[in-house]
A protein has these predicted regions:
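Generic hydrophobic alpha-helical scaffold/packing signal
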Residues: 17-20, 30, 40-47, 64, ...
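Amide-donor transfer/coupling interface in amidating biosynthetic enzymes
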Residues: 86-184
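Fold-independent oxyanion-binding glycine-rich loops
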Residues: 5, 22-24, 65, 82, ...
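Cysteine-nucleophile active-site neighborhood
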Residues: 26-106
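Short acidic (Asp/Glu) and glycine-rich catalytic loops that position anionic groups and cofactors
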Residues: 19-25, 59, 153-155
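Glycine-rich, charged/polar anion/phosphate-binding loops
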Residues: 2-8, 63-65, 99-103, 142-145
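Hydrophobic, well-ordered secondary-structure elements that form the walls
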Residues: 19, 56, 77, 118, ...
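Acidic, glycine-rich loop-and-beta core segments that form the ion-binding/anion-interacting portion
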Residues: 1-43
């Protein structure tokens, strides 16, 4: 069963088994997202408890520490050690091809993923012992023209919007990850 979650208005994360955070433009709602301290805190707590999360583009931005828009910093969820700085021109725009290079809950190492990206933000990674990049960019920009895909706990967040037709297993892998966690 799919459940809609509104990060602008909801105060808590409902009882869910896994979470997909799609793309969008969080910079257009940065103040409202930052103001919803209760939801941001609840989501971070669920992530720390092991909630499987798959996030694309705007979802990546929302899970970071902060979003900087026109020089003003807005706190985000803080589940990933990066800040995002909004630029005036696109930082990534077009089709992407990624090679999975690091262990993660959703894709085997060596798999090639296809998708697209469109983002005005630039990622600034903060050093962290418990977070790793897991994709090598073969086509596109990702985070810096070379890497994409941050993995921490059961979270995988990427600028790339995966093309479901080109990667039909991705949704099932989110659910399999949840069920494999239940059996541990």
């Amino acid at each position: 069963r799919l459940i809609d979650i509104n990060s602008l208005e909801d105060r808590e994360v409902p009882a869910i088994d896994a979470l997909y955070i799609g793309g969008g433009f969080p910079e257009t709602q940065a103040q409202a997202l930052a103001d919803n301290v209760a939801f941001r805190g609840a989501l971070k707590q669920r992530i720390e408890e092991g909630l499987p999360v798959y996030a694309e583009c705007g979802g990546l931005m929302y899970l970071g520490k902060a979003l900087v828009v026109d020089g003003k910093e807005f706190p985000m969820v803080g589940a990933l050690p990066l800040s995002l700085i909004l630029e005036k021109k696109p930082q990534g725009h077009g089709y992407t091809v990624l090679e999975v290079t690091g262990k993660n809950p959703y894709y085997p190492v060596g798999e090639v993923l296809k998708g697209h990206e469109f983002h005005y933000s630039k990622a600034v990674l903060h050093p962290s012992d418990d977070t790793r990049t897991v994709f090598k960019v073969l086509r596109g920009e990702g985070m810096d023209g070379k890497i994409d895909g941050l993995c921490r706990k059961n979270v995988l967040a990427t600028y790339t919007h995966i093309h479901a037709g080109g990667n039909p297993q991705w949704a099932g892998r989110v659910l399999r990850n949840k069920f494999s966690l239940d059996s541990k």
